[in-house]
Swiss-Prot record:
Any one GO BP annotation for this protein: innate immune response in mucosa
Family membership: Belongs to the beta-defensin family.
Record's protein name: Beta-defensin 1
Superkingdom in the source lineage: Eukaryota
Gene symbol of the encoding locus: DEFB1
InterPro entries in UniProt: Defensin_beta-like
Length: 68
């Protein structure tokens, strides 16, 4: 009986982690916007992009700009 409670508790923890979506999707190959920006040669900035760079996208779920 104690084993079944332990398995149920583990399942609940696993499902609660999957409910957030971010970590679960990243683990399945969906990359975050920060990763895509840096991988393409950009940098994530909360302030305005420096001179001679353009906004190429967003970072941190749209809270910052990807400058390249």
């Amino acid at each position: 009986m104690r084993t079944s409670y332990l398995l149920l508790f583990t399942l609940c923890l696993l499902l609660s982690e999957m409910a957030s979506g971010d970590n679960f999707l990243t683990g399945l190959g969906h990359r975050s916007d920060h990763y895509i920006c840096v991988r393409s040669g950009g940098q994530c900035l909360y302030s305005a992009c420096p001179i001679y760079t353009k906004i190429q996208g967003t970072c941190y779920h749209g809270k910052a700009k990807c400058c390249k």
